[in-house]
Amino acid sequence: MNFKYIVAVSILIASAYARSEENDIQSLSQRDVLEEESLREIRGIGGALLSAAKVGLKGLAKGLAEHFANGKRTAEEREVMKRLEAAMRDLDSFEHPEEASEKETRGFNQEEKEKRIIGPVLGLVGSALGGLLKKIG
């Protein structure tokens, strides 16, 4: 008789353990889903900020290009213009989607372009604005 009780208690313990394992797996799955949703939201916000920055930089670059096109330019200003034009071409390439076969590498390529473009563009815009302010002042 004691053997039956031992077996019954063992089965109860095993089923309780199995249920706790299932609950742990479900809670981990729910956490993973929530983390993925959070990452998607963060990427969406980052993409929106990047789009706004691109539009602002493109407008600023076009304004600077028009300003520099109207007057005589020094060698330094010509170099700044060449860099701005290159940056504009790179920014335009962000807006044109690649073929479906290249979608997997697009995210990596876009991150590399962003790293390569945003730093120098901000430096160029700063130096161009500084030069413009020196001329005005």
UniProtKB/Swiss-Prot annotation:
Superkingdom of origin: Eukaryota
GO biological process: defense response to bacterium; killing of cells of another organism
Main location: secreted
Modified residues (D-allo-isoleucine): 118
Localization per Swiss-Prot or TrEMBL: Secreted
Region Disordered, residue ranges: 91-112
Tagged with keyword tRNA processing: no
GO cellular component, as recorded: extracellular region
Residues the record lists as Asparagine amide modifications: 70
InterPro entries linked: Bombinin (IPR007962)
UniProt keyword list: Amidation, Amphibian defense peptide, Antibiotic, Antimicrobial, Cleavage on pair of basic residues, Cytolysis, D-amino acid, Hemolysis, Secreted, Signal
Stretch forming the signal peptide: 1-18
Transmembrane parts of this sequence: none
Modification Isoleucine amide, positions: 136
Matching Pfam families: Bombinin (PF05298)
Tissue specificity comment: Expressed by the skin glands.
Function: Has antimicrobial activity, but no hemolytic activity. Preliminary evidence indicates that this peptide does not lyse and thus kill the bacteria by its antimicrobial activity. Bombinin H has antibacterial and hemolytic activity.
Family membership noted in the UniProt record: Belongs to the bombinin family.
Protein name: Bombinin-like peptides 1
Organism: Bombina variegata (Yellow-bellied toad)
Taxonomy of the source species: Eukaryota, Metazoa, Chordata, Craniata, Vertebrata
